[in-house]
C-alpha cells in the first residue's frame, strides 16, 4: 500500500470483523500515517455463518456490544498517535438484512446494549439505566426446517442490570428479499404478528406461517427507561 500510495495524508477505513487488527495490518502494509475508522461495528452479514437455506445468522446483542467495545479499544484507542477517531455504524436505525443488524437505536430512539457500551467508552461513565441484554431465544424453531401451521414454544433469555420491569414484544417476519449492496435501501418485511398466539412474561407460543419459505422469529425486550434488547432467529417452513 505505502509503495503504490505514497502521498496519502489521512486514510479512512470502513471495516467490521477485521477492525481489531487494523493498526497491525497498516504497519504490515508499510503505512504508519494517520487514519480514521470511518465505519466499524458488529460482524457484517458477509462475515457470519449462514443457515442451509442462506439466511445470515445475526450476533446476539451481548456479542455485538462486546465486539463494538473490542473494535474501539483495539483499533481506535490502541493507536492514539495514529488513529484520529472513528464512527460507529449505525447510530440510528436501518433495515439491512434485518432491522437490528446495524441499528444501535430503534426507530423510537431506544438504546441497544451496543449504544450503551459506546456511550461509556466515549464519556468514561456508564449510562444511568442500561438496556436489557438478550443472550438467547430458546425454541425448537431456531435454525430449523419446520412444517406449516405448527405451534412452537419460545422463551427469551435476558438480563437487566437494574432489574427493571420488562415488556416483551414477539414478531414473525419473512426473510427479507430486498437485499441491497453497499448499504443501499432495503424494504422492511411485513410483520406477521398474528402468528404469535400467546405471550406471557418472557415466553410465547408462535405458530409457523402457512406459506413455505424463510422467516425470522423476532423479540424486542424493553425496560421502560429507553433501553431495548432485540434479536431474531431464522427458520424455514417446508413445502407441504
Residue map of PLM features:
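Short beta-strand edge segments in extracellular beta-sheet folds
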Residues: 234-240
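Distinct, well-ordered alpha-helical segments
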Residues: 1-5, 22-26
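Exoplasmic/lumenal beta-rich domain surfaces
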Residues: 167-207
Amino acid at each position: 500500500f505505502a509503495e503504490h500510495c505514497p502521498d496519502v495524508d489521512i486514510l479512512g477505513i470502513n471495516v467490521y470483523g477485521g477492525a481489531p487488527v487494523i493498526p497491525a495490518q497498516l504497519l504490515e502494509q508499510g503505512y504508519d500515517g494517520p487514519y480514521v475508522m470511518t465505519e466499524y461495528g458488529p460482524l457484517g452479514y458477509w462475515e457470519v455463518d449462514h443457515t442451509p437455506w442462506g439466511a445470515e445468522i445475526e450476533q446476539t446483542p451481548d456479542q455485538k456490544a462486546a465486539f463494538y467495545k473490542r473494535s474501539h479499544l483495539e483499533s481506535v484507542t490502541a493507536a492514539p498517535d495514529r488513529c484520529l477517531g472513528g464512527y460507529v455504524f449505525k447510530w440510528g436505525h436501518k433495515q439491512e438484512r434485518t432491522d437490528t443488524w446495524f441499528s444501535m437505536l430503534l426507530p423510537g430512539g431506544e438504546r441497544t446494549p451496543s449504544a450503551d457500551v459506546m456511550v461509556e467508552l466515549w464519556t468514561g461513565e456508564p449510562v444511568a439505566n442500561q438496556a436489557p441484554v438478550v443472550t438467547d431465544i430458546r425454541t425448537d424453531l431456531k435454525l430449523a426446517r419446520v412444517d406449516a401451521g405448527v405451534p412452537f414454544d419460545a422463551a427469551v433469555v435476558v438480563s437487566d442490570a437494574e432489574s427493571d420491569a420488562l415488556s416483551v414484544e414477539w414478531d414473525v417476519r419473512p426473510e427479507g428479499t430486498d437485499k441491497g449492496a453497499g448499504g443501499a435501501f432495503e424494504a422492511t418485511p411485513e410483520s406477521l404478528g398474528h402468528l404469535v398466539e400467546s405471550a406471557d412474561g418472557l415466553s410465547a407460543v408462535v405458530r409457523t406461517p402457512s406459506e413455505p419459505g424463510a422467516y425470522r422469529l423476532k423479540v424486542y425486550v424493553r425496560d421502560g427507561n429507553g433501553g431495548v434488547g432485540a434479536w431474531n432467529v431464522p427458520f424455514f417452513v417446508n413445502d407441504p
